[in-house]
Amino acid sequence: MEHLKKVIISKRAELAAKGGHPWIYGTEIEHADEGIEAGDIVRVESKKGKFVGSGFYNPHSKITVRIFSTNANDTFNAAFWKRRAAYAVDYRLQVMRKEDYDCCRLVFGEADQLPGLTVDRFGDVLSVQVLSLGMERHKKEFLDGLIEVLRERQLAVSCVYERNDVKIRELEGMQQYKGFYRSPLLDPAAEKTRVDIVEN
């Protein structure tokens, strides 16, 4: 269990969070410890001091906390993010037909307890979009873990392309950009992949 700075939320927000709603709005925060920086992971507690969850904190966003864990014993290291990647991948392997898996949404934000993160798979290419500052800060750990998980399951990954050219990122205090996170292999087929991704 990590020692995290605390955020105390209203009774209404507590009930919503316990019901599965992962967003805490700024107006629902009763108290936040000093020294919390945008993008930090915080411990969310009720007014009575009960653990509600852990989430990404961003005072620049109307959604000030995005809860992504309800296990008080979680430690948010590389192993944690790889486990999250494995949960997302394995769930889809269980519920999808094999032929559909070559073109699918691997990660769908809050539905996979990965706030603001979308990952689409097109064959051996991953297209990634990050819309929350906290997830941006842990992007490398997650994506490196995801690539490992896919390869462990004999699912090839030639490149990862980031499509972070959306205005909503600015509301989180992030810049817009797009480009390769993990470049494709330098062969004719990979070069065609590079062109297709960038143009589409």
Model-derived segments and spans:
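A short interface-forming secondary-structure element
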Residues: G123-R137
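Structural motif
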Residues: I41-V42, V125-L126, S158-V160
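A generic alpha-helix structural signal
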Residues: K82-A85, V89, K139, L143, ...
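Non-catalytic substrate-recognition/targeting regions of SAM-dependent transferases
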Residues: G109-L114, T118-D120, K140-N200
